[in-house]
UniProtKB/Swiss-Prot annotation:
Source organism: Methylorubrum extorquens (strain CM4 / NCIMB 13688)
Functional description taken from the UniProt entry: F(1)F(0) ATP synthase produces ATP from ADP in the presence of a proton or sodium gradient. F-type ATPases consist of two structural domains, F(1) containing the extramembraneous catalytic core and F(0) containing the membrane proton channel, linked together by a central stalk and a peripheral stalk. During catalysis, ATP synthesis in the catalytic domain of F(1) is coupled via a rotary mechanism of the central stalk subunits to proton translocation. This protein is part of the stalk that links CF(0) to CF(1). It either transmits conformational changes from CF(0) to CF(1) or is implicated in proton conduction.
Sequence similarity: Belongs to the ATPase delta chain family.
UniProt-recorded Gene Ontology molecular function terms: proton-transporting ATP synthase activity, rotational mechanism
Entry-linked SUPFAM superfamilies: N-terminal domain of the delta subunit of the F1F0-ATP synthase
Protein name according to UniProt: ATP synthase subunit delta
Length: 189
């Protein structure tokens, strides 16, 4: 990782510092992938549960209440080890609100350490598995690296594809082409 404050935006701030500390500890203990799996399991629970999101976001709960509630949830979900201790620590330190950002930053650090580039791809409708593999292969050729594909379905695109990798973006959607034609026709008047 780059030093002297040149980390990416996800590794900046409180979330980035916590994620980096967790990554370094997990790396030292040979548990990087186990921690990632457990954080992903917690993140899935977070996205599915309105009650958990309220607990995480609300300052009305004390650190002790958050720690106890999160501890019970982790036990029920089978999330243990370093990831569970980390989540409990964020609750005890009143940083639970930043946990979703910490999880994103941890994922980014894991990808970076493995030389994997995240590509956000938006399409109008769900492509077949073969098309998804073709997209990955094309992006791998361009990036000269393994790709972690984050696929989003966006019917407003009408057709085509929008790809974002790092700071680069290619918009080959039908919506953008139609808007360009519309703009050209207005200028021709």
């Amino acid at each position: 990782m780059a030093q002297n404050g040149s980390e990416g935006p996800l590794l900046a701030g409180v979330a980035g510092r916590y994620a980096l500390a967790l990554y370094e500890l997990a790396h030292d203990q040979g548990q990087v992938d186990d921690v990632a799996k457990n954080l992903d399991a917690f993140d899935a629970l977070y996205r599915e549960s309105d009650d958990l999101r309220r607990l995480v976001r609300s300052p009305a709960y004390s650190a002790a209440e958050q720690t106890a509630a999160v501890g019970a949830l982790l036990d029920r979900a089978g999330i243990s080890g370093l990831a569970a201790n980390f989540i409990k620590l964020t609750a005890a330190n009143r940083r639970l609100f930043a946990l979703p950002g910490m999880i994103r930053a941890y994922r980014e650090k894991v990808r970076e350490s493995k030389g994997i580039i995240r590509a956000e791809v938006r399409v109008a409708e769900k492509p077949s598995d073969a098309v998804i593999e073709d997209i990955k292969a094309s992006l791998r050729d361009v990036a000269k690296s393994e790709i972690d594909l984050d696929l989003h379905i966006d019917p407003s695109l009408i057709g085509g594809i929008v790809v974002k990798m790092g700071s680069r973006m290619v918009d080959a959607s039908l919506r953008t082409k139609l808007n360009s034609i519309r703009l050209a026709m207005r200028e021709a008047r």
